[in-house]
Amino acid sequence: MDLHYDCAESPAAEQPSGKINKTAFKLFGKRKSGSGMPTIFGVKNKGDSKGTGKIGMVRSKTLDGLADVVLESNKKEEPCTEAGAGQLNPEKSPKVLTINADVSSNSSVAKSHSFFSLLKKNGKSENVRGEQAEQKAGSRQKRGLKGLFNSMRWSKKDKSYKDDKEGASESQPGLILPSSLTASLECIKEETQKPLCEKGKSTEDIPADVPLAEHSGDVNTSAEENSLKASEESPCSALITEQPQLEDAPLAQLQENLCQLPQPEVETLQNNKDEHVTGCGDVIADQDDDGGSSMGSKLVPGNGKKVMSKKNTNIVAYQGGGEEMASPEQVDETYVQELFSMIPPSEGASEKTEKVNGTTQASREVKCSDSAQDRNAIKPSKLKQVPVYRKERGDQNSKANEKRQCLRNSDEGYWDSPTPGQEEEEPRSVGKQALARDSCSGDALYDLYTDPDESIAKAQVEEPPLSHSHSKPLSPVTTSCPVKTASSNKESKIPISIKHLPVHTTNQGTDSSSGSATGHPHPVKSELPRTKIPVSKVLVRRVSNKAITETAAGKRAIHDPARKHH
């Protein structure tokens, strides 16, 4: 620590009072009047030992400056061995570079290493320190910023060596400093596991008894020995071989754990196979109920999600089995009771589940047949009521048909069909067959959830065109309102148009004068028999129109659908 204080105090005394940036001068030294660059990047004057000493004192925070402090104590030495020192660097640097892996990247580090090995061997000899000054000047010129920052990085670790040897002379910190720096440079060159080994080497490599005067050949051999020791890595290799053994222990434990984990997964796969065979999750549910949490205890340490997945499969299986319970109202109560009886208890096995599957399939067929029978039972009742109303109508069938078509347009809003023409007269006569054919279609399913009166009205609307299709031999014309019919009744629908109405007025003849102008009174006579059975909930309120006169009721019946359509 004394060395740092000496270096820090001397430049403060030498700097003039006008200087402000003291830290910059501590790092880069004083600026010469003739050059714009700091002297640390320049070349020292080899002849002026005083100048080198002053510049070295200014650069106190770098190891180069610390090395100059060691050299400053020997200012009296002249560069007598300058030529011999110049020959040392070119001989050492190639030998060290051959040992390094990367020649281009580590060349500067190798040069600094070779230089400090010289300082280490010749630190105590006063005659060689002048040689070190000249040699250091040449090596610093080639080293550049990389060597500078590498040396600055390890300046803090030198304090431990200095604390141990505070009572020693100035030359001994100079000896300890290069030896620790060689260790640091070797650590930079080698892998990260080597600093412990290299620190041991740095302490071991310091010679206890070194002759004061040695020749350049001895210095070369010592540099080669240091570089070879750095390449041998005998203690580090032992550590490297020991570390994989330590790492193998947790890896072996992990492998054992991984080998133990797939066992519960195999059990879950077998359970899934049983589930696929039975078609339901009853067998797995029985194992969970009887065994308690035995399966869960096996699966929780490995994968806790497996238990939840098994429970989910049970739920899905029961949903699939009880899917038929959500049936329409027409299904008998006995059918629901059969479903409850078919659900197996908790102790049921795969055979019971197969029976459940067979019974559910049979029950589906029974349901289809029952629904078809119910449909057939409803539709004959519809058709039986039609002739009664036909007798009451008498001569007004054609007008009732026209009236019904206009009224149906306001109810069935989600069916669209083009305007029928003469080519569609023949399909109208097949309306009864189409009604029986649609018992299993989507329209029939729609009728399940509608009023029975509406379905009877559909059959009633469909029956008259069978006998009165001859009253409509008209070509297609523009309709007053778009026609919307069911798929089963699409052939029996005839749109209301202005040109259709006068044709029927000629057949009736009684109301021809008013019918040709407005077309309203013609369906008036058919209003009373029509409203006995309401077509839909919208038209139920027209039952109260019985007390109204025929003309007023006809106008209201014609205008209301037109309003709703718009």
UniProtKB/Swiss-Prot annotation:
Residue stretches of biased makeup (Low complexity): 464-476
Ranges of biased composition (kind: Basic and acidic residues): 123-134, 155-168, 192-204, 364-377, 389-411
A Gene Ontology biological process annotation? negative regulation of canonical Wnt signaling pathway
Superkingdom of the organism of origin: Eukaryota
Bias-annotated ranges (Polar residues): 477-489, 504-517
What is the protein name stated in its UniProt record? APC membrane recruitment protein 2
* Source organism per UniProt: Xenopus tropicalis (Western clawed frog)
Q: Name one GO cellular component term.
A: plasma membrane
> How is it placed in the membrane, per its record?
Peripheral membrane protein
Ranges for the region named Disordered are: 120-176, 192-237, 277-307, 342-533
Segments forming a coiled coil: none
Q: Does the keyword field hold Secreted?
A: no
One example of the protein's molecular function in GO is: phosphatidylinositol-4,5-bisphosphate binding
From the Swiss-Prot or TrEMBL record, state where the protein is found.
Cell membrane
What family is this? Belongs to the Amer family.
Q: What does it do?
A: Negative regulator of the canonical Wnt signaling pathway involved in neuroectodermal patterning. Acts by specifically binding phosphatidylinositol 4,5-bisphosphate (PtdIns(4,5)P2), translocating to the cell membrane and interacting with key regulators of the canonical Wnt signaling pathway, such as components of the beta-catenin destruction complex.
